[in-house]
Design a protein with these regions (language model features):
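Conserved Radical SAM active-site core
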Residues: 1-61, 73-82, 242-263
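Surface-exposed cleft-lining segments at the edges of enzyme active sites
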Residues: 57-65, 93-103, 139-148
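Short, surface-exposed, charged loop/turn segments at secondary-structure junctions
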Residues: 136-144, 184-190
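A C-terminal junction/extension of Radical SAM enzymes
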Residues: 151-216
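Local cysteine-cluster metal-coordination motifs and their immediate loop/turn environment
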Residues: 213-240
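Active-site-proximal loop/turn and secondary-structure-junction residues that shape catalytic pockets
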Residues: 30-32, 54-58, 93-95, 127-131, ...
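Conserved C-terminal portion of the radical SAM core fold
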Residues: 70-137, 159-175
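Active-site glycine-rich loop that binds ribose-phosphate moieties when present
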Residues: 107-111, 148-155
Length: 263
């Protein structure tokens, strides 16, 4: 498969032959389209790990995400067909606004977590990184957001951690070095140590290769592309606009070696 560097536009290639791939780490808010192909991929010999984002944020932030109640049902099915260790729940990003304060996130986390207890062992959290594009999108919709203080972040994280512990779920922080410095466990989205335990038949890949400050990830290849997700989340940094993402998705050719054919 070929994929472009999002900045230099240089084209890179990577083999997707099962014998050449240690494992595939997926990120998604909606795995239902994948479920019919899961058994096929497993029989082909692919080792797979899943990050499943379920937040229940309002439509003005996540206009096209599935209802969180549906997402918990799909996560359960995915977990039953793999294992609770193979599926990680992501409750991120946390966006603090006038409406969405700490109390809202605590209630929402407890509601979602109570449905997922026994079906996942980990939950990754992070507070929204206010990139310029993210700020503009929020401001355009008139959303009054603010950057919480470290004390607020830590207090909320500890509240979520306490709820999660009662549900048998471990909370980890993704790219939040300020929280890690206060004792919150660092998340590793591409966790070579965990993947080696899940797939012991594969040669371990343990090289630490962070993608940004506070990242704990193992070396990997990101074969996704910007401006291809049409869910249109307001806080997203990977899309210029939902319209552009729709246009680009229409150009997708399953027979092409890239998600999108080159112009």
């Amino acid at each position: 498969m070929a994929y472009p560097n999002p900045f230099s536009r240089a084209i890179h290639t990577v083999s997707l032959a099962p014998e050449d791939v240690h494992s595939i780490v997926f990120w998604s808010k909606h795995y239902r389209p994948l479920l019919p192909y899961l058994e096929y991929l497993q029989k082909k010999g692919f080792c797979m790990f899943f990050h499943y984002t379920i937040t229940g944020l309002p439509r003005y932030l996540e206009p096209c995400s599935p209802p969180w109640e549906l997402s918990t049902t799909i996560l359960k099915e995915l977990s039953l067909r793999t294992s609770p260790r193979h599926v990680t729940w992501r409750f991120d990003p946390i966006v603090i606004t006038e409406e969405l304060d700490s109390r809202w996130y605590i209630r929402q986390f407890a509601s979602i977590g109570s449905r997922l207890s026994g079906f996942t062992q980990r939950c990754y959290i992070s507070f929204v990184h206010l990139y310029g594009k993210t700020r503009r999108n929020l401001q355009r919709l008139g959303i009054k957001f603010r950057e919480p203080s470290l004390e607020e972040k830590l207090e909320l994280t500890l509240e979520l951690e306490g709820i999660a512990q009662g549900l048998g779920i471990e909370v980890l922080a993704c790219c939040q070095p300020d929280l890690v410095a206060k004792g919150i466990k660092m998340g590793r989205c591409v966790d070579g140590e965990l993947l080696s335990k899940l797939f012991p038949e594969r040669t371990p890949i343990l090289e630490h290769r962070p993608t940004r400050p506070g990242c704990g990830c193992t070396a990997s290849k990101d074969i996704g592309m910007y401006d291809t997700c049409s869910l249109g989340c307001t806080y997203c940094y990977a899309n210029q606009s939902r319209t552009l993402a729709h246009i680009r998705r229409q150009r997708h050719d399953p027979s092409c070696q890239m998600l999108l054919p080159t112009p």
